[in-house]
């Protein structure tokens, strides 16, 4: 069946991706809602800001003349002055007696410091005068009398409320100033001018009508509008980079996705979203107070173009990032940063307008400038419209054009960067690729069937490559020649592939084999174009994979299933398939049919409506494979396609691939050797990046295999030695591989195949040897692979160590002997015999040490605690600096004309103008003009008092005539804060000038520093105490919640099964947590008291706080331990509880203080309740009560308020709570902590009464297997036997477990789901029982019951010599070995530390532990990983570590739940050998669950297969094969020169030997048959006849083997599934989802 190369249009892919993106948007509601609501929220917030800060419009204000200068404004004034000299005393004498008699009282001070000290206790009517010399002085008023701001210019709004400038007049400042000036003038000239100065008038200058614009809300509006559209770009960037991070984009390109379609789909989607959002926002903005005068269309254009450009800016950033969490943050901060740059451009008036548009390539700056222009137009009641697009300092037309150009530029740049920036995967173009003609004019080339010489000549075949048959010559689809790939890792070159050369043929399935890290995935990535080779050549149907344009053509033929699951999480299975089918170019009218076919082929109809993220691991692999086979591609590249699948699912996949292999190329990698053996026509074994061999299974087995396996199922009377002698007599090369009470396994070499018939005849005739049945199977591909791997290690050693190559057998024998010894030593490790108390101390110390180091390594928790501390200390320091910076904030202001008046020749300044001078004296004022000239004051003459007409000006002087001299009216601008005293100073200096004195009077205004009032001090202290309480309560979850993490990863269960005493665990943690929390509290409390030294200190009261602290710390820590048992499903447990603690503390404070105003009694009752009920409150309540008691002048009336009452309960309650928490902790430990193996000396069992569990007899089942029934009777007999010599280590009797499913509302009843159905079995000492079954069969339920995680509904379990119900009270079972399916390992702890922790928990001494670690690392090849943290370990090493931990301490019972999951074949064999050796002839028992039948066959003494919660069969592997096996498999390899006629004769001969043999799919050189068991009456006769046929026909070699355990398993599960379906019972193929509480949901 041929398949044309798919051609798919860009627009069709764009429509498909649009649909995909739309569905994702609909299902990722959180981000989608934020994208919609975030802009609207900001818009409404800005409208609110506009309403709260409208432009203030002020009408024209006429001149306002103030009251005459009145000396009585200084009534009762206390005037202190310093220094005391003759001159200063004379001045103050004249002021107090001549100018202001009966008004002021003078006080003398020797220095300024004395005056300042005295001012602290003076009332507000105290004023200080500090003379610097006879002509200069400083006036010091209290801050509430005069302005204290250093800002020289006030707003119009500020003056309209309380004019600060006029305070100098109303406070008496100018009166005192004029009086002192008059006294100085009189002393200097003997002329009294007090009357003239006293006659000075003050006039507030009239102001024009004006609209005052507040720049702060404007800035907020501009920034918020810039940020408003950021969620679109933020989530878009995160989504695109996340797809890149998951490799989805690159694999979509392999499926034929056009880059244009990818970018266009996002552009169109977000263009639509932003169009609608911009339209809505524009309508709202123009209909509200935000832009009421502007055109909706113009505002819409601005919003729409900015939204587009900001989104495209985010698109441009995506090629620059590899992590999605980084790109979103950068996009947001770039948006804010450029928004502020644009704001600065607008606010800085001196910024050159010509340079503004230099920032136009950044859309955020351009948008800010445009919105600023809209606001500018709004100020003039015009608004933005099409008529004024070109008006203003920043024309809107330029903004619109630049935003449009920005959008185009960003999209083009995004596409360009995506093509040229090198990434982890994918081919990249050169930086100037768009200039090459080949890019614009691609020439299509059709693939061709290449002959042997098309590529680099003929690849020479050697002894490691099996030649293909003639029918495949010329069908080389994939040519690989000299491929090399080198990576840079930590500064070193790592060779992933080394000179790899071989061909892959059309019509064959080729398997790539090799352990982890050999380069299989790298080769796959090269073939599909994900990464280029460093050297060498590879082609797919003539298309070179290193050429990007040719690779695009090759990809049209490729379907790929990578190691990573490629799918869209929120889409359903059917949606994923449909969308990717459309991307692949499958015709629209065929998509539904194609998708349904894939769903049917892979048995996914029942999950087609499930979201991909909710699928199990095996189901996700099915989906990825289904995506790969969509459209029936010419080439399939599958990287571990069946990883994580159960055997039934794997067989479904195998059948699918076999069905689709004709005229196609299938390449897959796998760690399952049986999968490669059954499925692949050719296998390529890669080791260390080099090719070890290529050929069929028979070629590999015959060349590198170890022979046949002869398995015998024996009875208890079997004469093992006689039997072995018989086997050796016929086949001297036979070796005994495995031996137990029920089975013997021998290895028979290939070279002795002609002697097999004689051996089997002898076995048939010697029935007295105790052989019940026997079978023979050929060496597995696993054995071949391992032999090649050992050879690879020898090759590697040759180059570095040996000068002469040792024999392979010697090396192999030596290495395995060493490993055997290591493992025997490992299996003999014992826990030290220590007393219970010594063990308790050792465990407590170990847990404390581990907890301490864990806290040090948990950077997130440490950072969180330090951040909270930093917040508290920052607030403390900030408030302290604010408190002590008032003195520094009060700066002296020199009242000189330079503040507001220009000098002649100066240019206008922000608030500097010329001095207006009005002559109302009708006389010559030339001398006055001369004075201003001498003082460098620019003067502007006016004729009348219409100051508004010449506005703006800072001040004016109106010259009026008096009897002796001029009298002035000081006209000041109310926005110029210091203009009035400056005018008075100018007038005084004019009088001096007029009297021919060249010196000038200088004056400073310096307000007194006023201490913070007592109420402010109390509020500040109260606030900081409350802050301490809120922050300190947020800390314990960050270091005392480790138990929650231990429960999540099941580490606590593992520790308990290892013999950990619960009290040692909790006290060990408390030993670290309590001192740490205490130190933190002491630091915070100490800083609170240190920064508030004014706190009135009572020793007794402080001791009460200390006693409260001592009880509070353990109370909160213990409560946190109890809280860790709850809300286990929360992702961020520590953050969640930290937030809850803080909110609870804040709520308690708020409630108690609010109710205080309702009545003291209510507040006290609540305080008592909170102290008793809420453990985080007592310290807070105690501290606040202590502060209130310690306040100075606090009310002492006990009837109304007595803080001592509140203090006492806060001190006592933590100690009572500690007692309660200890009992509660024991209760939760008993209920949720799982089984304790050892008896705890401190934690007593709360209930010694055992549960009355029902022990019903199982219902009669006539169809129950006889072996299962015999096992049940055996268990029943053993349970009733009181004098048995040796009971089994594990006995399970009638174990039944039901789960309550969700209530069926239609039937108003609960539906029971049965997990296990009356299971009975036993495991003898020294035996390993394999527990097999498909997913949901009940294996994990049994394991969880055995470890105590869940309770059975009925039945009994006995472990060791005691029942599991009473094992907690008996100390006979010191520890149990448990290797769970999920690694219970701490990610930041090293491998060696794991050994040390578990060794100490199991009672091993430190000296023994060092030796044990050395043995374990040698035995399991872990030495190089000892100092690595778990998160850096490969999956296989983690499983080895779990196994090693389960074996520490010589446990009597070990439970191994899928121990070799995730390991490559070499590591699996290593693990299996370790398991076999550890339990070899030992008095310990083990149960092993697995999905790998070869694992059960290699490790287990007996196997029990479960289906649908029932035990289907039990027995040795050979027994099950003989009983349930359907037959044998015969494979014959013919010699090359055989003719078709002879092949026909051979087939007739096979049909004669095995009449019912059915021929399987074969090639011209290989014949394969399935032989029914009925046709093999005798193995000896079968081998005898096959040997005759080998000599009579051109047979090069053959293999004849029994059905594998995998085939038996599949047949059993299929039969059971048919029975279940017919009876309507639970289907075994359905997955059960197990929660942490082990509830099963159907």
Curated annotation (Swiss-Prot):
Keywords: ATP-binding, Cell membrane, Endosome, Glycoprotein, Golgi apparatus, Lipid transport, Lysosome, Membrane, Nucleotide-binding, Repeat, Translocase, Transmembrane, Transmembrane helix, Transport. Its main location: Golgi. It is a multi-pass membrane protein. It is found in: Golgi apparatus membrane; Lysosome membrane; Late endosome membrane; Cell membrane. ATP 1 binds at residues 514-521. It comes from the Eukaryota. GO terms for molecular function: ABC-type transporter activity; ATP binding; ATP hydrolysis activity; ATPase-coupled transmembrane transporter activity; lipid transporter activity. It is an enzyme of class 7 (translocase). Residues 1249-1268 are annotated as: Disordered. GO terms for biological process: cholesterol efflux; cholesterol homeostasis; cholesterol metabolic process; high-density lipoprotein particle remodeling; lipid transport; negative regulation of macrophage derived foam cell differentiation; positive regulation of reverse cholesterol transport; regulation of cholesterol efflux. It holds the Pfam family ABC2_membrane_3. The keyword Transmembrane applies. This is Cholesterol transporter ABCA5. It comes from Homo sapiens. The lineage of its organism: Eukaryota, Metazoa, Chordata, Craniata, Vertebrata.
């Amino acid at each position: 069946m041929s398949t044309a190369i798919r051609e798919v249009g860009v627009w069709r892919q764009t429509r498909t991706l649009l649909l995909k993106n739309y569905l994702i948007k609909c299902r990722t509601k959180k981000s989608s809602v934020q994208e919609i609501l975030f802009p609207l929220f900001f818009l409404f917030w800005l409208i609110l800001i506009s309403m709260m800060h409208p432009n203030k419009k002020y009408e024209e204000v006429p001149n306002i003349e103030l009251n005459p200068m009145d000396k009585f404004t200084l009534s009762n004034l206390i005037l202190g002055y310093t220094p005391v000299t003759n001159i200063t005393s004379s001045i103050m004498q004249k002021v107090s007696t001549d100018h202001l008699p009966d008004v002021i009282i003078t006080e003398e001070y020797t220095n300024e410091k004395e005056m300042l000290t005295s001012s602290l206790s003076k009332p507000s009517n105290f004023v200080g005068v500090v003379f610097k010399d006879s002509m200069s002085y400083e006036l010091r008023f209290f801050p509430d009398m005069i302005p204290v701001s250093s800002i020289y210019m006030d707003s119009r709004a500020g003056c309209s409320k309380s004019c600060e400038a006029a305070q100098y007049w109303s406070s008496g400042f100018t009166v005192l100033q004029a009086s002192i000036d008059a006294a100085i003038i009189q002393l200097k000239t003997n002329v009294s001018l007090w009357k003239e100065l006293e006659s000075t008038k003050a006039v507030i200058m009239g102001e024009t009508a004006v609209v005052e614009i507040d720049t702060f809300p404007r800035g907020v509006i501009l920034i918020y509008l810039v940020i408003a559209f950021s969620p679109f770009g933020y989530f878009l960037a995160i989504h695109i980079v996340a797809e890149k991070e998951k490799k989805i984009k690159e694999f979509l390109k392999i499926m034929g996705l056009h880059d244009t379609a990818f970018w266009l789909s996002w552009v169109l989607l977000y263009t639509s979203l932003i169009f609608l959002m911009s339209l809505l926002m524009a309508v709202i903005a123009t209909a509200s107070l935000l832009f009421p005068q502007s055109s909706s269309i113009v505002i819409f254009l601005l919003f729409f173009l900015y939204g587009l450009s900001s989104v495209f800016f985010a698109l441009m950033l995506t090629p620059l990032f590899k992590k999605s969490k980084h790109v979103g943050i950068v996009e947001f901060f770039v948006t804010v940063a450029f928004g502020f740059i644009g704001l600065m451009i607008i606010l800085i008036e001196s910024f050159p307008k010509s340079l503004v548009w230099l920032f136009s390539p950044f859309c955020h700056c351009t948008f800010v400038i445009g919105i600023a222009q809209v606001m500018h137009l709004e100020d003039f009641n015009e608004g933005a419209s099409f008529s004024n697009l070109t008006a203003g300092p920043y024309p809107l037309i330029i903004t619109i054009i630049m935003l449009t150009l920005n959008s185009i530029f960003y999209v083009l740049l995004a596409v360009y960067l995506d093509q040229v920036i090198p990434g982890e995967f994918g081919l990249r173009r050169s930086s100037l690729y768009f200039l090459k003609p080949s890019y614009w004019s691609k020439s299509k080339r059709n693939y061709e069937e290449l002959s042997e010489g098309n590529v680099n000549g003929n690849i020479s075949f050697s002894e490691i490559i099996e030649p293909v048959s003639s029918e495949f010559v010329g069908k080389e689809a994939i040519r690989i020649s000299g491929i090399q790939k080198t990576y840079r890792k930590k500064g070193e070159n790592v060779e992933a592939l080394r000179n790899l050369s071989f061909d892959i043929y059309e019509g064959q399935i080729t398997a790539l084999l090799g352990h982890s890290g050999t380069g299989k995935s790298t080769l796959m990535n090269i073939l599909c174009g994900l990464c280029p080779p460093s050297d060498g050549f590879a082609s797919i149907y003539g298309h070179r994979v290193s050429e990007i344009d040719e690779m695009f053509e090759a990809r049209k033929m490729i379907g790929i299933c990578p190691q990573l699951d490629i799918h869209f999480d929120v889409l359903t299975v059917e949606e994923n398939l449909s969308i990717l089918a459309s991307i692949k170019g499958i015709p629209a009218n065929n998509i539904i049919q194609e998708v349904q076919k894939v769903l049917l082929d892979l048995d996914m109809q029942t999950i087609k409506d499930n979201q991909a993220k909710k699928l199990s691991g095996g189901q996700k692999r099915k989906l990825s494979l289904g995506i790969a086979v969509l459209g029936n591609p010419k080439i399939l590249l599958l990287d571990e396609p069946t990883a994580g699948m159960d055997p039934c699912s794997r067989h479904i996949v195998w059948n699918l691939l076999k069905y689709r292999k004709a005229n196609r190329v299938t390449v897959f990698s796998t760690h399952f050797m049986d999968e490669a053996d059954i499925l692949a026509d050719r296998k390529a074994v890669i080791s260390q990046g080099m090719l070890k061999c290529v050929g069929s299974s028979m070629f590999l087995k015959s060349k590198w295999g170890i022979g046949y396996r002869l398995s015998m199922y024996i009875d208890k009377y079997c004469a093992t030695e006689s039997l072995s002698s018989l086997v050796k007599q016929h086949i001297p090369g036979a070796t005994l591989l495995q031996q137990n009470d029920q089975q013997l396994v021998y290895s028979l070499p290939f070279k002795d195949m002609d002697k097999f018939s004689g051996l089997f005849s002898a076995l048939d005739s010697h029935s007295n040897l105790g052989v019940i049945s026997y079978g023979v199977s050929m060496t597995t591909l696993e054995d071949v692979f391992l032999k090649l791997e050992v050879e690879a290690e020898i090759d590697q050693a040759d180059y570095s160590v040996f000068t002469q190559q040792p024999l392979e057998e010697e090396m192999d024998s030596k290495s395995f002997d060493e490993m055997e010894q290591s493992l025997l030593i490992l299996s003999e490790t014992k826990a030290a015999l220590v007393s219970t108390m010594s063990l308790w101390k050792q465990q407590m110390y170990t847990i404390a040490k581990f907890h301490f180091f864990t806290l040090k390594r948990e950077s997130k928790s440490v950072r969180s605690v330090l951040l909270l501390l930093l917040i508290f200390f920052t607030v403390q320091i900030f408030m302290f600096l604010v408190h002590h910076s008032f003195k520094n904030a009060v700066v002296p202001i020199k009242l000189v004309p330079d503040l507001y008046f220009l000098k002649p020749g100066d240019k206008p300044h922000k608030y500097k103008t010329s001095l207006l001078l009005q002559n109302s004296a009708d006389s010559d004022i030339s001398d006055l003009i001369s004075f201003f000239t001498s003082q460098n004051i620019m003067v502007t003459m006016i004729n009348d008092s219409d100051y508004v007409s010449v506005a703006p000006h800072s001040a004016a002087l109106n010259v009026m005539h008096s009897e002796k001299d001029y009298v002035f009216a000081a006209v000041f601008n109310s926005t110029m804060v210091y203009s009035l005293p400056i005018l008075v100073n100018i007038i005084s200096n004019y009088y001096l000038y007029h009297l021919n004195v060249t010196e000038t009077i200088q004056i400073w205004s310096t307000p007194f520093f006023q201490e913070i009032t007592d109420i402010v001090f109390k509020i500040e202290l109260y606030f900081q105490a409350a802050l301490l309480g809120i922050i300190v309560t947020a800390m314990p979850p960050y270091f005392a919640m480790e138990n929650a993490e231990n429960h999540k990863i099941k580490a606590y269960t593992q520790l308990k099964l290892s013999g950990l005493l619960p009290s040692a665990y909790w006290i060990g943690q408390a030993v670290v947590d309590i001192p740490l929390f205490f130190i933190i509290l002491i630091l915070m409390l100490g800083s609170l008291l240190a920064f508030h030294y004014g706190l009135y200190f009572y020793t007794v009261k402080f001791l009460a706080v200390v006693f409260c602290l001592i009880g509070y710390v353990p109370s909160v820590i213990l409560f946190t331990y109890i809280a860790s048992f709850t809300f286990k499903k929360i992702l961020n447990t520590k953050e969640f509880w930290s937030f809850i603690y803080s909110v609870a503390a804040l709520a308690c404070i708020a409630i108690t203080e609010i109710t205080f105003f309702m009545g003291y009694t209510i507040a006290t009752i609540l305080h008592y309740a909170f102290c008793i009920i809420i453990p985080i409150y007592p310290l807070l309540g105690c501290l606040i009560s202590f502060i209130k008691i310690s306040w100075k002048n606090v009310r002492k009336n006990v009837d109304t308020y007595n803080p001592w009452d509140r203090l006492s309960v806060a001190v006592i309650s933590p100690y009572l709570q500690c007692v309660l928490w200890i009992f509660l902790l024991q209760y939760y430990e008993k209920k949720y902590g799982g089984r304790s193996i050892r008896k705890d000396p401190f934690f007593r069992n709360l209930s010694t009464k055992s549960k009355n569990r029902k022990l019903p007899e199982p219902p009669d089942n006539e169809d129950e297997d006889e072996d299962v029934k015999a096992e049940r009777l055996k268990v029943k007999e053993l349970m009733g036997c009181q004098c048995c010599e040796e009971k089994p280590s594990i006995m399970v009797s009638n174990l039944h477990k039901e789960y309550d499913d969700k209530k069926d509302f239609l039937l108003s009843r609960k539906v029971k789901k049965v997990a296990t159905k009356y299971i009975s079995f036993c495991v003898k000492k020294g035996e390993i029982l394999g527990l097999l079954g498909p997913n949901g069969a009940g294996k994990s339920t049994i394991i969880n019951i055995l470890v105590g995680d869940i309770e059975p509904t009925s039945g009994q379990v006995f472990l060791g010599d005691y029942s599991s119900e009473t094992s907690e009270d008996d100390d006979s079972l010191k520890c149990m070995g448990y290797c769970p399916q999920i690694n219970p390992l701490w990610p930041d702890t090293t491998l060696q530390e794991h050994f040390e922790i578990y060794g100490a928990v199991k009672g091993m001494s430190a000296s023994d532990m060092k030796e044990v670690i050395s043995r374990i690392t040698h035995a399991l090849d872990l030495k190089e990983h000892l100092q690595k943290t778990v998160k850096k370990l490969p999956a296989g090493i983690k499983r080895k570590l779990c196994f090693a931990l389960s074996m520490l301490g010589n446990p009597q019972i070990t439970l191994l739940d899928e121990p070799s999951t995730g390991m490559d074949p070499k590591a699996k064999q290593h693990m299996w050998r370790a398991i076999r050796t550890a339990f070899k002839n030992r008095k310990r028992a083990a149960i092993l669950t697995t999905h790998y039948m070869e694992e059960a066959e290699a490790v287990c003494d007996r196997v029990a297969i479960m289906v649908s919660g029932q035990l289907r069969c039990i027995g040795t592997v050979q027994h099950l094969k003989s009983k349930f096996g359907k037959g044998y498999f015969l494979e014959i390899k013919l010699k090359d020169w055989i003719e078709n006629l002879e092949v026909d004769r051979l087939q007739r001969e096979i049909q004669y030997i095995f009449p019912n043999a059915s021929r399987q799919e074969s090639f011209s050189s290989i014949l394969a048959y399935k032989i029914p068991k009925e046709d093999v009456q005798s193995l000896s006769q079968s081998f005898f006849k096959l040997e005759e046929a080998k000599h009579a026909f051109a047979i090069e070699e053959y293999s004849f083997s029994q059905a594998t355990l995998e085939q038996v398993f599949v047949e059993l599960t299929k039969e059971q599934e048919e029975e279940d379906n017919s009876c309507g019972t639970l289907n075994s193929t359905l997955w059960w989802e197990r929660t942490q509480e082990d509830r099963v949901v159907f």
